[in-house]
């Protein structure tokens, strides 16, 4: 049976992650309160941030920026929008 969490991002019960997706206390908080669906949404947003801001993940400052954005996305006021991104029209 799948583990469920009360997802703070979706505001409902949903299937939880199988393991903490990030090291340390932040990873534990995410594992305890973020669903698989919300994590997948974050990964898409993170990819847009990396691409639009041309982040080099070998740079410690870029990794720190993404960690702050991840924490803001789940537990704060939201992550930065990807600058230059134009959503496709329907």
From Swiss-Prot:
Query: What is the scientific name of the source organism?
Result: Albidiferax ferrireducens (strain ATCC BAA-621 / DSM 15236 / T118) (Rhodoferax ferrireducens)
The protein in question is named Probable Fe(2+)-trafficking protein
**The organism's lineage?**
Bacteria, Pseudomonadati, Pseudomonadota, Betaproteobacteria, Burkholderiales
Q: Which Pfam families match?
A: Iron_traffic
InterPro entries annotated for this entry?
Answer: Fe_traffick_prot_YggX, Fe_traffick_prot_YggX_sf
The entry's family comment says: Belongs to the Fe(2+)-trafficking protein family.
Its function, per the record, reads:
Could be a mediator in iron transactions between iron acquisition and iron-requiring processes, such as synthesis and/or repair of Fe-S clusters in biosynthetic enzymes.
This entry's Gene Ontology molecular function terms read: iron ion binding
**Keyword Iron carried by entry:** yes
A Gene Ontology cellular-component term: cytosol
Q: Name one GO biological process term.
A: cellular response to oxidative stress
Q: Which residues form a coiled coil?
A: none
Alphabetized PANTHER family for the sequence: FE(2+)-TRAFFICKING PROTEIN-RELATED
Q: Does the keyword Iron apply?
A: yes
Keywords annotated in UniProt:
Iron
């Amino acid at each position: 049976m799948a583990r469920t969490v009360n997802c703070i991002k979706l505001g409902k019960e949903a299937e939880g992650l199988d393991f903490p997706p990030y090291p340390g206390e932040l990873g534990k908080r995410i594992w305890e309160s973020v669903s698989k669906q919300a994590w997948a949404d974050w990964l898409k947003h993170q990819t847009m941030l990396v691409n639009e801001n041309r982040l080099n993940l070998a740079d410690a400052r870029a990794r720190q920026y993404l960690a702050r954005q991840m924490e803001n996305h789940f537990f704060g006021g939201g992550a930065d929008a990807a600058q230059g991104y134009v959503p496709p029209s329907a």
